[in-house]
Regions:
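Acidic/polar residues in short coil/turn loops that connect beta-strands
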Residues: 75, 123, 165-167
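Short coil-to-beta-strand transition motifs
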Residues: 2-8, 39-46
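Conserved, short, structured surface segments that act as functional micro-motifs
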Residues: 60-73, 93-141
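Short, well-structured beta-strand-loop connectors
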Residues: 40-52, 89-104
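Polar/charged, compositionally biased leader and regulatory segments
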Residues: 1-17, 24, 76
């Protein structure tokens, strides 16, 4: 599961697909999410900032998003983070998963502070159910990340200290080589 906040839990307040809004049936192209314990919005994937702006002109089709960031993901898809109170990135910036993009807000067409998270295919038009990206079920509710293992916590320390760049290689290798897991733990303890 990926939570696009600096939080371990998130509330899904409106899912992907048909919904009733203002008495009318409408198609909702993303998820409306509220971070539990944090309003800092983070990148779900790595990529390049394609758009970082505030839209107030109602003749612009994106005015409903208000203050928003769009990431062109390394996978070629577009990832939208909308209704932000503020933005922490600029067009052209390179981001990695987990980098702060801004702060959750209520700009544009919004009835309260939340993040509208939307994914579009490479053509920029076809929306993707965020469940396939985030692993958060398309059902209103609160979702929490599973607790990290000791190995994952140790790898986080090594990444934060710049000892390793990415934990993926180590996570795949360590279970195969028992002593490697112990080595990683000892390195992390020494750096704390």
């Amino acid at each position: 599961m990926i939570i696009p906040f600096k939080a371990s839990s998130v509330k899904l307040t409106s899912g992907y697909g048909s919904r009733i809004l203002g008495g009318k049936t409408d198609f909702h192209g993303g998820y409306d999410l509220v971070g539990v314990g944090s309003t800092d919005v983070t990148a779900a994937v790595g990529g390049k900032v394609a758009v970082s702006r505030m839209v107030t002109d109602k003749s612009n089709l994106t005015w409903q998003w208000g203050n928003y960031v769009c990431i062109l993901g390394d996978d070629g898809r577009y990832y939208y983070y909308c209704h932000l109170a503020s933005r922490a990135v600029n067009k052209g910036d390179t981001v990695k998963a987990g980098d702060k993009l801004g702060v959750m807000g209520s700009t544009g067409y919004s009835f309260g502070a939340h993040l509208h998270f939307e994914v579009r295919e490479k053509n920029g038009r076809t929306t993707v159910n965020p469940e396939t990206i985030l692993g958060i079920p398309n059902k209103v509710g609160t979702y929490t990340l599973p607790a990290k293992s000791q190995l994952e916590r140790d790898l986080d320390v090594l990444v934060a200290r710049g000892v390793i760049k990415t934990p993926e290689y180590w996570q795949q290798t360590a279970p195969k080589v028992q002593y490697l897991s112990k080595l990683i733990h000892n390195m992390a303890e020494a750096l704390q």
